[in-house]
């Protein structure tokens, strides 16, 4: 059964032309179409020319958003001994060892990011069925399996995000809040674009970037001209 589109969204869609917009113009329109009764996220949806069923065409990495995410990130850390105290001193919201693993196994999910030291990963691996579907399983590629807990916690609190291409080769990333200025959103979006280009999978063939759309959480999709975004220098974005 087709999903019913709200009258609010129908009206907002009328403001968006079916064409690729220049980056700044698109982000201004994104802000104008953020009319929900809560502070919406600014989202990017990037379709890439990859087939993630092949290991050399998978994309999973992290990006540090220069202007932050606009969110308060709750971080949990699983470690042993003094590393637990180090994590708490560095600003982790939760930290523990076997007892924290047990709490999570019983359904406690009061965190947005889970970091683990390499020596506890055999125990953490048992939580895969719970953590995997939620995108919370620690991984070296995601920067969430490390002994350098202070650095990892600082980076994620400051605006570091992990993202991956889904089965269709589409990347969905939140790159700020609609309360951000157009300039700050553009700086974050440019950082995301450069990160995706830097981490192009070795098996990607042909045209890598297919499309990029941005939107507010409850707003209409707005297409951005890929070449214009790639050609933009960060000094221009600033």
Curated annotation (Swiss-Prot):
Gene Ontology molecular function, alphabetical: rRNA binding; structural constituent of ribosome; tRNA binding
Family annotation (InterPro entries): Ribosom_uL1_bac-type, Ribosomal_uL1, Ribosomal_uL1-like, Ribosomal_uL1/biogenesis, Ribosomal_uL1_3-a/b-sand, Ribosomal_uL1_CS
A Pfam family recorded for this sequence: Ribosomal_L1
Gene Ontology biological process terms from the UniProt entry: regulation of translation; translation
Positions of disulphide bridges: none
GO cellular component, one term: large ribosomal subunit
Matches recorded under NCBIfam families: rplA_bact (TIGR01169)
Assembly and oligomerization: Part of the 50S ribosomal subunit.
PANTHER family in alphabetical order: 54S RIBOSOMAL PROTEIN L1, MITOCHONDRIAL (PTHR36427), LARGE RIBOSOMAL SUBUNIT PROTEIN UL1M (PTHR36427:SF3)
HAMAP family for this protein: Ribosomal_uL1_B
Family, similarity comment: Belongs to the universal ribosomal protein uL1 family.
Protein name (database record): Large ribosomal subunit protein uL1
Gene coding for it: rplA
């Amino acid at each position: 059964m087709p999903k019913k589109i709200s009258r609010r969204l129908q009206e907002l869609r009328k403001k968006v032309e079916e064409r690729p917009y220049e980056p700044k113009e698109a982000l201004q329109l994104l802000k104008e179409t953020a009319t929900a009764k809560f502070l919406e996220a600014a989202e990017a949806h990037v379709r890439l020319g990859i087939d993630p069923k092949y290991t050399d065409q998978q994309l999973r990495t992290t990006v540090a958003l220069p202007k932050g995410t606009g969110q308060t990130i709750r971080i949990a850390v699983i470690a042993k001994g003094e590393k637990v105290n180090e994590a708490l001193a560095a600003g982790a919201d939760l930290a523990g060892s076997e007892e924290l693993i047990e709490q999570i196994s019983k359904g406690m999910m009061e965190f947005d990011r889970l970091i683990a030291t390499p020596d506890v990963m055999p125990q953490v691996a048992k939580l895969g069925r719970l953590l995997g579907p939620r995108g919370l399983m620690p991984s070296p590629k995601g920067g969430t399996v490390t002994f350098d807990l202070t650095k990892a916690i600082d980076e994620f609190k400051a605006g570091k995000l992990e993202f991956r291409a889904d089965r269709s080769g589409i990347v969905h990333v939140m790159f700020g809040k609609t309360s951000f200025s157009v300039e700050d959103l553009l700086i974050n979006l440019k950082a995301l674009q450069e990160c995706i280009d830097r981490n192009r999978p070795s098996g990607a063939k042909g045209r890598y970037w297919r499309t990029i759309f941005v939107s507010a959480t409850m707003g209409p999709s707005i297409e951005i001209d890929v070449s214009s975004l790639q050609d933009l220098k960060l000094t221009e974005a600033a």
